[in-house]
Design a protein with these regions (language model features):
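Alpha-helical scaffold within the catalytic cores of cyclic-nucleotide enzymes
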Residues: 108-109, 140-158
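Short helix/loop segment flanking the catalytic signature motif in cyclic-nucleotide metabolism enzymes
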Residues: 103, 130-147
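Short loop/turn elements at sensory-signaling interfaces that couple input to output
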Residues: 8-33
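Active-site-proximal alpha-helical element of nucleotidyl cyclase-like catalytic domains
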Residues: 99-120, 128
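Conserved nucleotide-binding and Mg2+-coordinating catalytic segments in signaling enzymes
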Residues: 47-69, 83-97, 105
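A short glycine-enriched loop-to-beta-strand structural element that forms part of the catalytic core
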Residues: 132-134, 160-180
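A short pre-motif secondary-structure segment
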Residues: 120-123, 163
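Per-ARNT-Sim (PAS) sensory domains and their PAS-associated C-terminal
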Residues: 1-7, 16-19, 161-163
Length: 180
C-alpha cells in the first residue's frame, strides 16, 4: 500500500428526498505538506491540534481527556499521586478567580521543579491533579511527594502575598496494574 496522505470532504444533501453523501478525495502532495521554507505545515498543524486537545489551557499540563485516552488503562509500575489544593474555593471566593488561577499555576510550577521530564502531571479538574511517575522506586516516590509538598508550601503566589499554599497528597505504587 502506498504511503500517501489524503484529505476527504463529505457533504450530505438530498436529491428528490433521497439522502445522498458526496465525497471529495484529494491526495496531498509536498506542496500541501511542506511550505516554501521547508516547514512541515500539516504535521505542525496536527501537533498544534493535539496540544489543544490534550493540554489544560490555564496550566499547560495534560488534561482529563489525555488521562481518559492515554493514561487510565496504562499497565505499568509507577508511583501515582492525587494532589488537591487546600482551600481553593476560599481563594476564589475571597480574592477572586484570578487568584485561584495564579495559585494553580504556582502549584504546577512547583511540581514541575520536582519531577522528571518523563513524569506526567494531569489536571483532572478544578484543583485536582494526578501525578504519574513511571518506573520509580517507592522510597524515591515518597521523597518526591514530600519534596513537592514542601516546595508548594514555600511557593509565593505572584500578586497575592497573603496566600499561603498547601496541598493534600495521596500516593500509591502500581505494580503491573492499570493507573485507574
Amino acid at each position: 500500500m502506498e504511503n500517501n496522505i489524503y484529505q476527504i470532504i463529505a457533504k450530505y444533501f438530498e436529491i428528490d428526498g433521497v439522502p445522498c453523501v458526496m465525497e471529495m478525495i484529494h491526495r496531498l502532495d509536498n506542496e500541501n505538506l511542506i511550505d516554501n521554507d521547508g516547514r512541515r505545515i500539516l504535521m505542525d498543524n496536527l501537533t498544534g491540534y493535539k496540544n489543544e486537545l490534550y493540554r489544560d489551557p490555564l496550566t499547560g499540563v495534560y488534561n482529563r481527556r489525555y488521562y481518559e485516552d492515554n493514561i487510565k488503562d496504562l499497565n505499568e509500575n509507577a508511583g501515582v499521586a492525587m494532589i488537591d489544593l487546600d482551600d481553593f474555593k476560599l481563594y476564589n471566593d475571597f480574592y477572586g478567580h484570578n487568584a485561584g488561577d495564579m495559585a494553580l499555576e504556582t502549584i504546577v510550577s512547583a511540581i514541575k521543579k520536582c519531577i522528571r521530564s518523563s513524569d506526567k502531571i494531569i489536571r483532572l479538574g478544578g484543583d485536582e491533579f494526578l501525578l504519574v511517575l513511571p518506573g520509580i522506586h517507592s522510597n524515591i516516590f515518597n521523597k518526591k511527594l514530600q519534596q513537592i509538598r514542601t516546595r508548594i508550601k514555600e511557593a509565593k503566589v505572584d500578586g497575592y502575598s497573603k496566600i499561603r499554599l498547601s496541598v493534600s497528597i495521596g500516593g500509591v505504587m502500581t505494580h503491573n496494574e492499570t493507573i485507574e
